[in-house]
Curated annotation (Swiss-Prot):
SUPFAM superfamilies: P-loop containing nucleoside triphosphate hydrolases. It comes from Salmonella newport (strain SL254). Residues 42-45, 166-170, 247-252 are annotated as: Interaction with substrate tRNA. ATP binds at G17, P18, T19, A20, S21, G22, K23, T24. This is tRNA dimethylallyltransferase. The gene is miaA.
Length: 316
């Protein structure tokens, strides 16, 4: 697409960054001075009843700056990158039709990638998912997994022999990663985002600062009632650690503590470590991201001014 045709597209803003980098605070400030509406890009904030451990914006923040795509799933439900892309495009179209600019804020980089580039027909292999499938096969046999595929994707099951573990495993893996069947995905192709996107990433200047912020925020969550929040989820009886919601950083570690598998101190240590690892993965994504402008989270006023310099002209 050439620059002229790109300039005629509706505008959108991405505000990305690692966990605990101050994205939400900056987005709320930007909404005060720009004609923007916020869309959450976070695979944990979609879940109802998971507020403290996800650092979900509080009632006052949401009153000042409503976020779309919050609290749209029960923790027992799955939500894929394909689901997000569909929902986000719908919200962006609504916002644009109202004469405003979508501001997408969050740290789930896979969602940003899916939205920006479209979904590639098949997701990349996931060693963790593949390992779970192989473990299931060792316990139940490949014939049982073929029957499972028969229920999920009968078209693929008819094509794949029960004695072909590689193809059988891949078909199941694709479904578990994307929430879509192999048959569905091979019938579709990705479409690039039909918007002129201004992309920003906010992060502290050093890894040490980010680690300090992560540790501080984890302790703030604990002081705010995080344990009680997870105990309420645990008490439901229908949730478990195979669900994406309970595998969220912090929740998985608190769950292990509640089940008596680890001590409280070990839970805190593992929770902080897991959050740091998440931030590291997010930063790896962002360092390889094309066309992103970096903002310093330790200087929020300057970060706001830098966004306004770039975006202010498009808001006139």
């Amino acid at each position: 697409m050439n620059d002229v045709s790109k300039a005629s597209l509706p505008k959108a803003i991405f505000l990305m960054g690692p966990t605990a980098s101050g994205k939400t605070a900056l987005a709320i400030e930007l909404r005060k001075v720009l004609p923007v509406e916020l869309i959450s890009v976070d695979s944990a904030l979609i879940y109802r009843g998971m507020d403290i451990g996800t650092a979900k914006p509080n009632a006052d923040e949401l009153k000042a700056a409503p976020h779309r795509l919050l609290d749209i799933r029960d923790p027992s439900q799955a939500y894929s990158a394909a689901d997000f892309r569909r929902d986000a495009l719908e919200q962006m179209a609504e916002i644009t039709a109202a004469g405003r600019i979508p501001l997408l804020v969050g740290g789930t980089m896979l969602y940003f990638k899916a939205l920006l580039e479209g979904l590639s027909p098949l997701p990349s292999a996931d060693p963790e998912v593949r390992s779970r499938i192989e473990q299931q096969a060792a316990e139940l046999g490949w014939e049982a997994l073929h029957q499972q595929l028969q229920e999920i994707d009968p078209v693929a099951a008819a094509r794949i022999h029960p004695n072909d573990p590689q193809r059988l495993s891949r078909a199941l893996e694709v479904f578990f990663i994307s929430g879509k069947t192999l048959t569905e995905l091979t019938q579709t192709s990705g479409d690039a985002l039909p918007y002129q996107v201004h992309q920003f990433a906010i992060a502290p200047a050093s890894r040490e600062l980010l680690h300090q912020r992560i540790e501080l925020r984890f302790h703030q969550m604990l002081a705010s009632g995080f344990e009680a929040e997870v105990r309420a989820l645990f008490a439901r009886g229908d949730l478990h650690t195979d669900l994406p919601s309970i595998r969220c950083v912090g929740y998985r570690q608190m769950w292990s503590y509640i089940e008596g598998e680890i001590s409280y101190d070990e839970m805190v240590y593992r929770g902080v470590c897991a959050t740091r690892q998440l931030a590291k993965r997010q930063m790896t994504w962002l360092r390889g991201w094309e066309g992103v402008r970096w903002l310093d989270s330790e200087n929020p006023d300057r970060a706001r001014k830098e966004v306004l310099q770039v975006v202010g002209a498009i808001a006139d």
